[in-house]
Amino acid sequence: MIKEVYLIRHSKPLKVNNDKNMDSLQIQNEKQPLSIEGENIAREKLNIKELKDIDKLYSSSYVRAISTAKYIAENNNIEINVINDFGERKFGINSWDELPDNFGEKQFLDENYKTEFGESQKEVRERTFNALMNVLKNDDKKIAIVFHSTAMLFLLMTWCKVIPDKDKYNVIFNNNIVFYGKYFDYCKIFKLTFNDKNKLINIENIKHD
């Protein structure tokens, strides 16, 4: 049975001043809601034909992901199933000042690079891949998953070559460029098609109208 999985980045979050916030940086990140603009982006960009007749909807546990997923849930009259393992990469720091210089570049080039308490590229990829494989064990044919930009890129690197080009990068699957740019836009959608043995056979970059 062919299965279609739509990987969707969350919409635009709200920026707030956390100087007096006693929560850990990780909890602050997980609690970050969508901005008004983010709500409007999600409402518009997720109301497309590709995201109709979804059998099962998943989201990370982050507030901005669930808040994005609710538009797909409403359009399809289905519930949101929360899975923690679709969450974003964990930095493992207490303040942004602790993040090493050129952290993103170093982690991109070395799959095992991480802070002492954070996650490596490889760990994020394995975590999200295992979660996806568990989802594919079910009989649902059309699945939507809302999660996060870096986690999505690291997951795609399971099957794709990612080649830097100055400040942008190419994501290549089976010698076809499926993405070229600096980052995934808010509500970016990739359609992954799996065969009856849960082997990935195609990746499509879904364009918004």
Task: Identify what each model region corresponds to.
Residues 50-53, 135-141:
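Glycine-rich phosphate-binding loop signature in dinucleotide/nucleotide-binding domains
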Residues 4-8, 58, 141-147, 151:
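Beta-strand elements within well-structured catalytic alpha/beta cores of enzymes
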Residues 43-47, 129-137:
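Generic structural signal for well-ordered alpha-helical scaffold segments
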Residues 1-3, 48, 78, 82, ...:
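Acidic, low-complexity terminal tails and accessory targeting/binding regions
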Residues 2-3, 8-80:
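Active-site-proximal alpha-helix that buttresses catalytic centers in soluble enzyme cores
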Residues 11-14, 62-64, 87-88, 149-152, ...:
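Short, solvent-exposed loop/turn segments at secondary-structure junctions
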